Amino acid sequence: MKLYAFVVILAMQSFFGAGITRAALPGQKDYLSSIEADKIRNAESPDERIKLFLSFADDRLKKLQYELEHPSQTRHAEMLNSLLNAYVGCIDDAADVIQLGIEKQQNIRKGIDLMAEKTKEYLVILQKIPTDSPDAEMYKENLEDAKEGTQDASKEAEAAKRKVAPPPVRRKK
């Protein structure tokens, strides 16, 4: 009976302890390092946040290309899927910052233009990744998600260009 009570108490502690640990890091994204999360948190404007998220996405995409060209001996599939998921997370977060900036009527024109430009570049890179190789089954589903997420972000950026008013033009006297 004492053993049963001990197991129940231990299980409850681990269950509730996990919730406390998660609550301690409210804004931490699992695909960002602590330094990257600090940079996002310290960014003063939405344009800066968009730029940071896109640079992190670019970094993940470069690492993915390297990993495809130089496969590691261990955990290759896990690494590819992790990089693809991190890339999609960065793109989605940049799109979220754009939507929030539009709702708050902030000046995010540069961020929108950068998003439209970069997502087109990223889509070209993603489409060049082979899907017919024997290893492609390991990451094919996440690659399709990445392509779809990038296309959606590109469409949203183009739509946001039309929504956001152009900057005022000064008249010369």
Which residues fall in each region the model found?
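Positively charged n-region of N-terminal signal peptides that target proteins for export
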Residues: 1-5
